[in-house]
Regions:
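Short acidic, hydrophobic short linear motifs in intrinsically disordered regions
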Residues: 24-47
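Short, intrinsically disordered low-complexity segments
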Residues: 49-52
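A short, conserved structural fragment
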Residues: 61-66
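Short, hydrophobic-biased segments on the C-terminal half of alpha helices
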Residues: 54-58
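N-terminal acidic leader/helix
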Residues: 1-31
Length: 66
């Protein structure tokens, strides 16, 4: 994933997560390395540009979240 695409998907994700009701933020939205990723975990990983953030964003792009 190129940096420009990453930044665009990151921006879209942060806008989307802001609209997710708080009770739903513990729901699983992705699985990375056999680890369940909730909205909260995804937000933390993506905000700090962690290595898993690209994989998370790619999965969310595939399912139409971003």
């Amino acid at each position: 994933m190129k940096d420009k695409e990453y930044q665009l998907l990151k921006s879209k994700f942060l806008k989307a997560v802001a609209n997710v009701p708080i009770p739903l933020r513990d729901e699983i939205i992705a699985v990375v390395d056999n680890e369940n990723i909730s909205w909260r975990v995804a937000e933390a990983e993506i905000k700090k540009d962690a290595p898993k953030s690209k994989v998370i964003l790619e999965q969310l792009k595939k399912i139409g979240v971003v």
